[in-house]
Every structure is written in structure tokens, then in C-alpha cells.
């Protein structure tokens, strides 16, 4: 902080503000003329070491120009007058000799002093009153260019009101900080007087600027507010001075002791001159708290010159209500701080009152703070303490005085108690509107009405509650668009009455022990509410036309003693309540069987609802493109049918030659546009039945004449394969007769070894000696194998294959060769003759892969099957049997036809 430290020199200063214009004339001297020290009032003739008399009249100061906009001041610059400088917020001080002309060359030097913000308050009872009286010293008679804020007369000087202050109580928000030129080298008495002059006014302001002070925020100042402005919120009023200011009043002339904090208020002033310090919370200040600075020093003794708090001061504005001009932000901040008071480190107040010793001095601010806190803010409620039942698995045990709400999830069974719906309602029910008559009670699927029973309790009658619940994927809750409707009449056997629980209509019935705690629900209908009434409710997001499925929800509270009950609940199957249900669409719930042979003729029983005497059952099949390919109506047995069951005969499928199951569909029709949803059904291929062979492990084709095997047939496991085994020849890949027969070819090698061994499970025929033939036949493979001796296949003997037709002309059964039929279910199975020793030549009739082993052939994908017609991967035993039986029964003989290559 700049200072002028010159002995026996007289200090004179001039304040120059923003605009570069000459100040108005001060007197006869004209502009720029300096006053002699003799004519200068004592308050402006500040000789170092000489105290300033309090009663002196101040010198007239030129009226300042309008304030410059902006948050920061420009740097110092030379002023038109010689020896002066212009600066904001700095002040230029011209030092000259005693009585010398300030304008003389070399008469003094210019020191630039920055703006000093005074933090002390004067104890003088009244400031100088001659300032406002000498209005001619201001040039135009107006005290300031800055009018005080509306509704607050004490924030700025009010001319004409005695007791107006010469000093602005907010140095940071006023551009005329008159006493800001003091330096550390100034006279202690002068500093004492000046500081106490300001302190008296600041204390008066602080006494009313508490937590909920009615004074406006410093942000309402004409000058733009900056974070450095010291007028932040103060603490509650108290009688002592701030500890950082007390040294100004107690120190003697000499070195000034250091302050524990900066001299600028910076929002840390919390006390006024009206009582003892109060217990302030650390949260009351934005920049610090008393708790951060250690113990508070004892308050100083009272000074002789203290303003009476009851006397009007410059900050007292009689005509303004206390809270008219308080900005909302000020009150909101005060409310926040007031709410935080109980968390203070110091003893909290009791019942909203401050500690003893402060009630008299701050009763009004305290009451105002309490009122504002109640108006602006609501106390945050404590967290809800959920019961253990809601936290841990929805326990169904409740108090009788606190039954669960209707949307509370409840189990249907708890320990030995169980609420069960013995008879479910139908899947459709036409709900009625409020403007139309009743549609009757909800009916059950097999006829009658739903039945509900409580198991595990039969001590005394209980009340059964029923309401309409939702049927969507969300949790079960009361339906917004449907409510239960009480049905009465001579045909209704169950007594009931309606009740309303949380806005939901509930139907209550009685479960009697003499009825085994069961109730026939013949008194409950469904009422449809108007969509617009529900959709316009606050917070309702569901749409009525998309929520037409409901459930019947039943609930019972079983007493357990000790004021406890166990609540169990059961919900029915979904019920469609849309108007389409008025068409009584048929519904299929179960049916048996689900598959049948393509020949049909079996009996099919359907179970469902809404079946009529003239209901039809139609089977259909659609192609991959969705087009209808087959449609057939089944014959319904009317004598064995009812409203809930239909008995019919499955029709015959259109294609009986299918080799794999066929998926079709059927539906029940009660007339035009009254069809049930389609149900799937499967037609299976015809199964060719085979007679068992003498050996239970062998099954083959029956023959019409002669025993099928000779005595020399060996059924031992097959020998290891030999290189010339023919596996890829198409003759081995055709398991059934389809096109024709092949012809014999010359033998590859003679039979010299023992009889061939047969693999178990093969369809085998005996062979006789002769030549070996190999031809590509689509249906059957004639592989003559020589036998050393065969009672059926010897020379001139003939073995009948059991075929329903004669072989072609080139085929001669008496030849010493008879064809074996390869097993279609064992791809690598065949009748293996033993090749001659050392024979390794591959015959011309075999393909290149014939010499591979069985394991290699299996890995390579070689297999017998229907490679020309049906893939082998999806073939089944039933399909193969059906195909073989079909071809054997209807295959025409084609003599002389050459098999395909």
C-alpha cells in the first residue's frame, strides 16, 4: 500500500474519476486553484502528527462524473492538470511544502496511492453534519450522482436526512472512498478517528445485515460487483467487535500489530455493537468461520463513544418494510444457512432460539430467519425404513392393521396354506360398458363358473377378495381399464358385496368350512371403464384399446394369532375382454394325438371352448410360398362332441407316397370369420411291417417258398475287408426295387474259400456257385456268390426270391448264382466271399475307391442309401420300410430295360 512518509509536510489530495474533464469551479479561485492552508478546513489539512478535529467542516469536493462501465479500472494516466495523475481505483496524492503553491515547478512530488478499503468502524456518535448542509460545495447542490437503492435509505448517503454519512459503508461498491488515502505512516490519532468514523456506520449496517437481513445485497450496487467486493453475508448480530478489528481501538501510538487476517472484510464480519457474540455455525460464511481460527479472544471493553442502537442512524430507513427489497437469492442463501444451524460445531439453538444473551439483541433477525426458512425450504424427510418383509423376499405375513396393498406381490402357497383355482375361467368374456346392461358372470372353460378353494385351513369362515388384475408381462396389479362387477339374481348362489380398496373395486365373498373352504364364483362380471376417463389421469401411460386382457385375482388373509395374518393370492389364466369375444371364437386348448399316418382314419379329440354342434375342423397345408396346397375337412362325430370337446376322424393325406413326416395345420370354424387359431399336426409315412427271422436279432424280407438260408450259412461276425471289396458300386446303394433288374456279368474270380460270413441284422438270401455278376441297378443288386455246396442253390436248383413277378428273360434263377439283397440300414454290409489267395486284382466293374477299408469308407462318406432320390442323412427306418413296401407292391416288370448308367 502506497504511503507518503514525510515529516512536517502538508498533504493535500484531489480525486479524479474516469472522464478527463475539468472539475467544476470550487470557489473564487477557479478550476485548478489550490486553497491555502489557512483557508483549508481542518478535516482536509492533514499534517502528519497532528490529529484531525472532529467538528471541522469538510472541504468541498468536486462532483464526480458518471461512473465508467466495466469491472476493471484503466491504468494510471497523466491528467490535464500538472502534477496530478488519473487512476481508478488509485488516488493521486500531491505532496508540497507548507503553504507552497502546489502548481509550482518542483513544489512537490506525486505519489500514487491505491484504493484502501477501511475495515474499522468509528465509535463516534454522529458523523460530521456540515457535509450535507453545504450543498453548494457539490456544485449543483446534489449530494451524489449515485442515488440510493429504492427502498433502502441507509445504503448510500441520503441528503437532507440528518445523520447521513460522509463515507460509503461499502467501499467496494462506491467510487468515492473518501478516507482511503491513509497510509501506515499517517498519524495514529487521525487514523483512529477516520477508522472509527466508518466503523460506526458499518456496525450500524451489520446490526441489521444478519442472516436474514432486510438490507439489499451488495450486488444491487450501481457499480458492477466483483468477487473482491467485501460485502458478503455477515454472521448474526452480536455485541462485541470482530477480533480482527479490536486492535484498532486498543493499540497505542507505535508499531501497529499484525492482524491475523487481512483488513478487508471479505465476508468475515459477523458482529455488530448490540450484544455478545452469538454462536454462529461454520456454514454461515462463504469464506470461513470462527471455528477455523481457534478460540475467540475476549471482547474489548466498551468504548466511551458508542452509538445508541435505538437511535436512528444512516442505515435506518423508517418507511421501508423489512423484507420488501431483499433479493430472493439473499433470502434463499440465508435459509440454507439457517437450515444448517443444527449441524454447527457450537451448541445448537433450542426451539429455534439463539443461546442466552443474544435473544434481546437479535430477536427480530432471528424471527425473520426462522420465518424465511419455513417459507422457502422444506426439510428433507428421513429415509423410509422399509420393513423386512419388503426387503427380504416378500414375506406374506402382515399385521391385521396393515394389510398389503392390492399391487403387492403375494405367493399362492405358504407353508401348508394354498389358494388354488380349481376351475379356470374361459379365455374369453365380453365385458360390458357402464352404459349397457350386464353381460353376466364369468364362465368356466368346461362349463359353469370358476371355483376357488383354500387348502390347509378350515377353522372358521374367511373372506375371499376378488379384483380384476392385469395380464401383461409386468407384475400383477389392479387393471386400470377394467373392474369387477357384482352379479345378482335368482340364479346366483354365492353371496357377495362390493368394497373399494385404494380406488379399486373389490368383490368380497365368504369361504365356509362346510363348503371345504371353496367358493363358486358365479357372482363376478367384468366392467369396462371408459378409456378417455382413465387415459387422462395424471401419470397414466397405458392405452385402453391395447390392454384388453385381464386376470381374475383372488386373495385371502388367514389369521395366525398375535395380530398377524398370512396373505395368499392366486390369479387366473388371461381372459380376453375385447368385443371380438362376443363372436364366441372357438378355442383349442389340447388335442390328441398330434400325429397320424398319411392314410388317416384315426380318431382325434379336441378340448377347448366355444364349440358348437355345427363346428367344423379343417386340415390345411401351405407351401413354402404360403399358398394353400391342400385343404380337407374332417368328419366330426356329433354324438361324442360337446361345447368343450370335439371328436373327429383324421382325413387321409393327399400324397401317400411321402418319405418323411409332413407338417400340416388344422383349425375349428364356427362360421365365417369365426375360426380358432391354427394348431399343428403331422402326417407320417406308411410303415412297412416285417416278419421276424428265426433269429431274434435278424429281420429280413419274407420269402414265398423254401427256407431262406442253407445249413452252411455262417452268421459269425464279418471278417476284415479285403482290398477288392466293392463299396461304391451303385448296386450296393439301392436298398429297394424301383426300376428293374440287372444282368449277370462274367465272374471276377471263382469261389475257392469257405462259405461267406453274414453280418447280423442283414436281409440275406442264399447263394449258389457260379459266376459273379455286378451291374448298376437302381433297385436290387444281383451279386452271385459261389457256394461249395448248397442244397437250394446247387446245379439246377432254384431259389425263389419271393418277388411278386417273374425275372426278366436274361435272368436265369437256375444258374449257379442267386442275387443277395443288400441291407439298406448297414451301408457297408454285404455278403463277403473270400477271394482266392494272393488275388489282388481289382475287377473292371468296380470304382476306384473299392479297396478302402470300412473305417475309411465310413469317414469318406460312402454309404448305401437313396442317393438318387432321398438323402441318406434324414432317412428313418419307417420311411425306408414304407418305401420298400410301396415299391414291392406296385412295381411293374420292365423286361429288357437297361439300367441307368
UniProtKB/Swiss-Prot annotation:
Residue ranges occupied by any RHD domain in the UniProt entry: 401-582
One GO biological process term: negative regulation of neuron apoptotic process
Stretches for region Calcineurin-binding: 114-119
Domain IPT/TIG per the UniProt entry, residue ranges: 586-683
GO molecular function terms attached to this record: DNA-binding transcription factor activity; DNA-binding transcription factor activity, RNA polymerase II-specific; DNA-binding transcription repressor activity, RNA polymerase II-specific; RNA polymerase II cis-regulatory region sequence-specific DNA binding; transcription cis-regulatory region binding
Biased composition (Pro residues): 61-81, 215-227, 254-263
Motif mapping: Nuclear localization signal: 268-270, 672-674
2 approximate SP repeats, as annotated region: 213-293
Origin: domain of life: Eukaryota
InterPro entries given in the database record: Ig-like_fold (IPR013783), Ig_E-set (IPR014756), IPT_dom (IPR002909), NFAT (IPR008366), p53-like_TF_DNA-bd_sf (IPR008967), RHD_dimer (IPR032397), RHD_DNA_bind_dom (IPR011539), RHD_DNA_bind_dom_sf (IPR037059)
Pfam families in alphabetical order: RHD_dimer, RHD_DNA_bind
Per-repeat ranges for SP: 213-229, 277-293
Gene Ontology CC, one term: transcription regulator complex
Gly residues bias (residue ranges): 96-109, 151-165
Inducers of expression: Up-regulated by BDNF. Induced by calcineurin in ventricular tissue.
Chain intervals for the UniProt region annotation (Disordered): 15-179, 203-362, 695-721, 827-869
CDD domains per record: IPT_NFAT, RHD-n_NFAT
Tissues showing expression: Widely expressed. In the brain, expressed in neurons. Expressed in the hippocampus (at protein level). In the hippocampus, expressed in both the CA1-CA3 pyramidal cells and the dentate gyrus granular cells. Expressed in a subset of hippocampal cells representing adult-born neurons (at protein level). Expressed in the submandibular gland (at protein level). In the olfactory system, expressed at low levels in the glomerular and granular layers and in the mitral cell layer. In the cerebellum, expressed at moderate levels in granular neurons.
Subunit note: Member of the multicomponent NFATC transcription complex that consists of at least two components, a pre-existing cytoplasmic component NFATC2 and an inducible nuclear component NFATC1. Other NFAT proteins, such as NFATC3, or members of the activating protein-1 (AP-1) family and MAF can also bind the complex. NFAT proteins can bind DNA as monomers or dimers. Component of a promoter-binding complex composed of STAT3, NFATC3 and NFATC4; complex formation is enhanced by calcineurin. Interacts with CREBBP; this interaction potentiates transcription activation.
Domain comment, as recorded: Rel similarity domain (RSD) or Rel homology domain (RHD) allows DNA-binding and cooperative interactions with AP-1 factors.
The protein's name in its UniProt record: Nuclear factor of activated T-cells, cytoplasmic 4
Lineage, broadest ranks: Eukaryota, Metazoa, Chordata, Craniata, Vertebrata
Gene from which this protein is expressed: Nfatc4
